[in-house]
């Protein structure tokens, strides 16, 4: 029987505001000993630079600095690498999370447009019946956004909009980020202590 800690998760980070969400998710999965297959879109790298101040000229060096100290394994796949392992349904994973998910990527997934590794990996989740979680970060929403989200929801995709709660008394930005990451982990029944639950 495969031990839980050896399982693979795919994490996508797009150019939507909130790259810190995807980074925290990756950190948390790696800290729990999981294997993470990471895909960052071109616009996602720009958000790394603009929002977080990271130097992105040496991408693999940056990722090693961010994630190299965790017990889990990180495998980085360039978004153009359509032949990567995660592009095939025969490669087994527990599911995929795109966090944050831009409306452009959400639309591509909704319409089966798999012209890069991010959207192809999401398409694989759908065709293989594996969990796919999207964390859209956009406001306000217009009708096309809502129609695409409804279409994906009807296909079994879990949508967890980046809408942190306040009932648990967050006092820092980290608290808000951890809440959203915790909600994603909840969708995979992964135990965590990232936020205080209602009634605790």
Can you say where each PLM-predicted feature lies in the sequence?
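A cross-family phosphate/adenosyl-ligand binding-site feature
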Residues: 2-133, 139-200
């Amino acid at each position: 029987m495969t031990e839980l800690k050896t399982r693979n998760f795919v994490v996508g980070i797009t150019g939507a505001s909130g790259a810190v969400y995807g980074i925290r998710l990756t950190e948390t999965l790696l800290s729990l000993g999981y294997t993470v297959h990471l895909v960052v879109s071109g616009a996602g790298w720009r958000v790394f630079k603009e929002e977080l101040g990271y130097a992105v000229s040496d991408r693999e060096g940056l990722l090693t600095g961010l994630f190299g100290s965790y017990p889990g394994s990180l495998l980085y796949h360039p978004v153009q690498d359509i032949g990567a392992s995660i592009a095939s349904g025969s490669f087994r994973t527990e599911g995929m999370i795109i966090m944050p998910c831009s409306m452009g990527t959400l639309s591509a997934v909704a319409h089966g447009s798999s012209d890069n590794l991010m959207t192809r990996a999401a398409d694989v989740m759908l065709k293989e019946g594996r969990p796919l979680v999207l964390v859209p970060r956009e406001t306000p929403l217009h009708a096309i956004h809502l129609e695409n989200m409804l279409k994906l929801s009807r296909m079994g995709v879990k949508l967890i909009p980046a809408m942190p709660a306040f009932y648990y008394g967050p006092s820092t930005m980290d608290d808000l980020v951890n809440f959203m990451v915790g909600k994603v982990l909840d969708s995979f029944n992964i135990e965590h202590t990232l936020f205080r639950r209602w009634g605790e």
